[in-house]
Amino acid sequence: MKLTEVTMVRVYLTEGDHQLRKLLDFLHRDEQVSGVTAFRGIAGFGRSGKAHESTLLDISMDLPLVVEFFDLPEKVDRVLQDLNQWVEPGHVVSWPARMNIGE
């Protein structure tokens, strides 16, 4: 199995930020990254300590969202330069990974 180096990135948002569609469009249309997945959390909190969670009594949803994507390190570096201009500091995490590319 052949492997290639990639960079994985996670972007942490909340539904209340209303930035999910903008982020997905940016990653898909503008940057054409290799793979993107969005996850909705059932609970979470950030630096503020304010809990974001779903309950049966809540009508408004402000749940945590995680958008994960990967691509070649050079491309991710370019994407992060643009992304860091409109995503709150401390809400983007990245790390090196390996992706299988066949035999």
Regions found by a protein language model. Give the residues of each.
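Positively charged, small/polar-rich N-terminal and surface patches that mediate targeting and assembly
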Residues: 1-103
